[in-house]
């Protein structure tokens, strides 16, 4: 059978329609499929003429409201985006040097932005009121935190063994031997370091404690007159002139999961009958060619499934500038002026229509709100580790989120997704310049969300958390190692952000946000240093004789003091600060009802399981975060890759590779302390034994089988599992459907398969006018690609081929018209397995099924060279 016949069999046509096509040669076939009868000078350009026909045969329902146009050279083009209306975006350069800022001030170059009030007198009075309340609350927080820290630090000083601080006189030590002086001072140097680190760490714990306590009281009372959600006045009509873009920046994500969540979200919006106010933009930065083709296929299928009326758009950037923030900047520059608001979605985000319409109404009701952040509930994962994290965020999260809102009010956090943003002020004030200088802390800002919130507030717009707004969801990493990969990026990003701490005009709250972001990771090396100094102090005590006389004529010796009962009391007080928020969280659930969490007994057992796992993993995270901080300062690059979105277990090999050094450290540490003083090992037991067990805990907690067993026993149950919202049920159903028809090896199918080639050709973006130089370059790319096996073709070459419609058309022609010449490509394609259901949307919809061949047979025939 010749290749033309195989090509015809691969087309989604009835048997009768196939019989009308000529099977003489590929060029004649494409000319027959060309309804416009374009006359192409080159024979290998003939597939360009049939692109429109192949698209209409393959995805007829998707093209009903999607315009097929022609570019300047008469080539078929599928409009994936609306017409751009460009806005001017110009980021202000950062002035992070306080000396430079002072010099600017002396010269009269004031860089502080000034904003004109947009509010009525009544609205100004309301804003002034909550600003005043917020300031008072924060002063109270500082007073409580510092007072508690000072008291605990003084108490810690009294229980340290060496109490001769006042007797140390450096002048008296000048005349004696240096080694003797050093050994006299060493215990006090170690104790001073311990005391300083204790004060910093206790202050960090204390701030979290008061935040959780205020959140508990707020949720227990149930009324918050400063809540942004309180401004909702029912289902008031949305202003038709204020349209909202739902934008989802993605990069090499799980295509099936992305489009399942998008479909569920959009159908939930349609259920509110408010879909006319929204558009969806899928903004791809993907650079894996197979994923790029899979995204195009998923997008065109989505159009048919939701009966799109020209409201769902897809774009893949050619130049990946500034990662996610650059992707959003590109959208704002080209299409931002068409919308009043935009909702930023992550690749794993799912939001209900009620939540989205409520966010829009909140923006309408609060004209000075620049960003309103919803609180995303974690759900959807099945590994034991992820289920513990889901349970923790669902149980403890409300307290800390409500507490953050209590202290921050309209000067709050933005987490980069599941939030609504007022587009115009974002364009004017929140475009991020590159950080000046060289090294790993310069260049593109990694953790852009905190910075954008700070700039929005600096411009006079409010940043709020709608902590009590339901219908916002996300997913968590499936295992510890995947979470730590994400933490490394966040660590680096937060350390970069701290360079902006002294930028002029920022609100003190957002300077504090930068500080807390750094402390989230810097606390790990500080804790490690605290433990190391404590161990060193124990070693000094064990191997050296105490210096009882610190001055030449001292009358009474200074005895080392050991007061274990006081140490236990301080430890207990610290544990109260650490664990009381968890107890308050479960107390709140006990008061409000435990049914959605599996009942009183099960939710209590679940809490104990989560506490045990968190205790076991805390030292592990400490060491990893310490390495992350050190590596960032040493200049080690961070690869910004998409996190694992599916349930994935850790292998034993990977666990021992990642945790082997921790296991060894735990063994050495425990052995050394047991040899020195068994009593000290008791204090370090939670640390060292957690390190020893780290590979085993990492593996077993990553297993979905363990998590599903806990789910069957109704342990670690969350309300989203007890009574799943429709939008999450739909997401799971659509994900299963997408998994069944997933497209692998997308690039090769884009070269060979008639339908996928037509799709990639029609959506390719490199549409240039005729040029002799360009033709030479195209021929060079094609010759270079076809003269080596496809598996040797690198990623950048594949992306270059995918972006040019002429190149994709000519590649398609070459492999079908000259299979013997390009046997390496044909043979490679024959070895690939095409999912039979991947072409489901390509099957035509007719009444007489007898006219169709079996789908599997069609796929087999589509493989060139199949006997």
Swiss-Prot record:
Region (Disordered): 71-91
SUPFAM superfamilies reported for this sequence: Nucleotide-diphospho-sugar transferases
Transmembrane intervals: 139-156, 194-216, 518-540, 568-590, 603-625, 680-702
Gene behind this protein: opgH
GO cellular component: plasma membrane
Stated name of the protein: Glucans biosynthesis glucosyltransferase H
InterPro entries, per database record: Glucans_biosynth_gluTrFase_H, Glyco_trans_2-like, Glycosyltr_2/OpgH_subfam, Nucleotide-diphossugar_trans
Pathway: Glycan metabolism; osmoregulated periplasmic glucan (OPG) biosynthesis
Top-level division of the source organism's lineage: Bacteria
Catalytic EC class: transferase
BP GO annotations: glucan biosynthetic process
One Pfam family recorded for the sequence: Glycos_transf_2
Main location: membrane
Statement: the UniProt record of this protein carries the keyword Cell inner membrane: yes
């Amino acid at each position: 059978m010749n290749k033309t016949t195989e090509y015809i069999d691969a087309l989604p046509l009835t048997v009768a329609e196939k019989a009308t096509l000529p099977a003489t040669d590929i060029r004649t076939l494409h000319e027959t499929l060309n309804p416009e009868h374009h006359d192409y000078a080159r024979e290998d350009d003939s597939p360009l003429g049939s692109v429109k026909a192949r698209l209409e045969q393959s995805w007829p329902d998707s093209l009903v409201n999607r315009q097929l146009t022609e570019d300047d050279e008469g080539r078929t083009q599928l409009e994936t985006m609306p017409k751009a209306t460009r806005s001017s975006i110009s980021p202000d350069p950062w002035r992070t040097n306080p000396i430079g800022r002072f010099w600017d001030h002396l010269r009269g170059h004031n860089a502080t932005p000034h904003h004109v009030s947009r509010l009525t007198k009544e609205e100004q009075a309301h804003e002034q009121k909550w600003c005043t309340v917020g300031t008072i609350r924060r002063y109270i927080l500082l007073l409580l935190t510092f007072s508690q820290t000072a008291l605990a630090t003084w108490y810690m000083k009294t229980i340290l063994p060496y109490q001769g601080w006042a007797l140390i006189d450096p002048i008296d030590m000048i005349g004696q031997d240096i080694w003797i002086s050093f050994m006299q001072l060493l215990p006090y140097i170690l104790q001073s370091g311990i005391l300083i680190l204790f004060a910093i760490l206790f202050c960090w714990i204390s701030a979290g404690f008061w935040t959780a306590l205020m959140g508990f009281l707020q949720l227990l009372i149930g009324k918050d007159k400063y809540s942004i959600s309180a401004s909702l006045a029912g289902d008031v009509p949305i202003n038709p002139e204020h349209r909202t873009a739902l934008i989802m920046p993605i990069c090499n994500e799980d295509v099936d999961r992305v489009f399942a969540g998008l479909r569920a979200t959009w159908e939930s919006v349609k259920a509110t009958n408010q879909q006319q106010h929204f558009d969806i933009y899928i903004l791809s930065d993907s650079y894996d060619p197979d994923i790029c083709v899979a995204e195009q296929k998923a997008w065109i299928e989505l159009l048919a499934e939701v009966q799109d009326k020209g409201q769902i758009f897809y774009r893949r950037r050619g130049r990946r500038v500034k990662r996610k923030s650059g992707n959003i900047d590109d959208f704002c520059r080209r299409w931002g002026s068409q919308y009043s608001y935009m909702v930023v979605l992550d690749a794993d985000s799912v939001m209900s229509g009620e939540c989205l319409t409520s966010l829009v109404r909140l923006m309408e009701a609060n004209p000075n709100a620049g960003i309103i952040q919803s609180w995303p509930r974690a759900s959807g994962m099945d590994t034991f580790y992820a289920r513990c994290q889901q349970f923790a965020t669902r149980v403890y999260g409300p307290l800390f989120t409500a507490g953050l809102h209590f202290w921050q009010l309209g000067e709050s956090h933005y987490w980069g997704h599941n939030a609504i943003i007022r587009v115009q002020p974002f364009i004017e004030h929140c475009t991020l310049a590159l950080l000046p200088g060289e090294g790993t802390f310069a260049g593109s800002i990694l953790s852009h969300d905190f910075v954008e919130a700070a700039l929005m507030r600096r411009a006079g717009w409010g940043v709020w958390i709608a902590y009590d707004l339901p219908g916002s969801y996300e997913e968590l990493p499936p295992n510890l190692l995947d979470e730590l990969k994400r933490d490394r990026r966040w660590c680096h990003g937060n350390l970069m952000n701290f360079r902006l701490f002294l930028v002029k005009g920022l609100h003190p709250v957002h300077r504090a946000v930068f500080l807390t972001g750094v402390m989230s990771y810097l606390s790990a090396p500080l804790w490690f240093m605290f433990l190391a100094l404590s161990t060193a102090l124990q070693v000094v005590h064990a191997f050296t004789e105490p210096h009882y006389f610190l001055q030449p004529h001292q009358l009474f010796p200074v005895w080392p003091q050991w007061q274990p009962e006081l140490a236990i009391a301080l430890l207990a007080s610290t544990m109260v600060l650490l664990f009381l928020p968890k107890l308050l969280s479960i107390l709140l659930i006990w008061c409000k009802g435990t049914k959605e969490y599996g009942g009183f007994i099960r939710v209590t057992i679940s809490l104990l399981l989560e506490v045990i796992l968190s205790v076991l993993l805390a030292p592990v995270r400490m060491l990893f975060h310490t390495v992350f901080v050190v590596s960032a300062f040493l200049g080690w690059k961070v690869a910004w890759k998409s996190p694992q979105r599916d349930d994935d277990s850790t292998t034993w090999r990977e666990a021992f590779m990642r945790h082997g050094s921790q296991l060894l450290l735990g063994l050495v540490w425990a052995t050394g302390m047991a040899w020195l003083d068994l009593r000290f090992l008791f204090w370090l037991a939670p640390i060292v034994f957690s390190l020893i067990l780290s590979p085993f805990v990492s593996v077993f907690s990553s297993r979905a089988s363990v998590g599903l067993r806990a789910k069957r026993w109704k342990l670690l149950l969350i309300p989203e599992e007890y009574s799943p919202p429709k939008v999450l049920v739909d997401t799971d159903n659509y994900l299963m459907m997408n998994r069944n028809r997933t497209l692998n090896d997308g690039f090769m199918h884009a070269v060979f398969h008639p339908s996928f080639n037509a799709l990639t050709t029609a959506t390719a973006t490199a549409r240039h006018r005729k040029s002799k130089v360009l033709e030479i370059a195209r021929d060079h790319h094609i010759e270079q690609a076809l003269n080596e096996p496809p598996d040797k073709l690198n990623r950048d070459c594949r992306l270059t081929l995918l972006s040019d419609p002429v190149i994709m058309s000519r590649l398609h022609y070459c492999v079908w018209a000259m299979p013997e010449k390009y046997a390496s490509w044909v043979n490679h394609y024959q070895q690939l397995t095409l999912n039979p259901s991947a072409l489901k949307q390509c099957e035509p919809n007719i009444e007489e099924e007898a006219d169709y061949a079996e789908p599997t047979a069609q796929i087999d025939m589509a493989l060139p060279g199949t006997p």
